[in-house]
């Protein structure tokens, strides 16, 4: 027998000893263990219940209320879309506030920003637009582009051009990127950075040559080239 091996009765004694120690440990700490396990279960059930009975109904209610505000927005009634028509038909401001954490509230921030921009309230519009958050290639770049518009109106040209270029890069599409690049080019011209403006106009011509912007950007390009001489 190897000196590493135990006689059978010694092995059984060792197992019994471990079992006894385990029983003693549970006797001493069993209450704490049960409480800890129960706490985990309660938290898990609480999260499920919160999602099922609070978050889901909240999101559904927010989405339902968005329809009325969106109808006002589509009709060009910015003030009504923003402020709402009372408790039964709140506007984007109230939806964003009352249903925080839902997709509808997130989108309401974007709508609020657009309405405020149209009203000439650029600082307030900027604040609302910055509260919007999404990771996709259509709405998020469009909001980023409008942030650039707000910054231009506020005279923050350096920040504006960064916002436009970020929007163009995030979208990387014929539908959004060309307009963002042209807006950035216009700002670069205001800043006297004609070389950068020319580079962006050329990008529209070459990379987005099938878009309507590619047909009209020639005028921007000629102007920037003339001013840059």
Q: Could you describe each region identified by the protein language model?
A:
Residues 1-39:
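N-terminal positive-inside, membrane-proximal cytosolic segments immediately preceding the first
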Residues 56, 96-105, 119, 133-141, ...:
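Short solvent-exposed coil/turn linkers within tandem alpha-helical repeat scaffolds
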Residues 78-79, 85, 122, 157, ...:
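TPR-repeat structural position
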Residues 100-157:
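Structured, soluble extracytoplasmic/luminal domains of envelope-associated proteins
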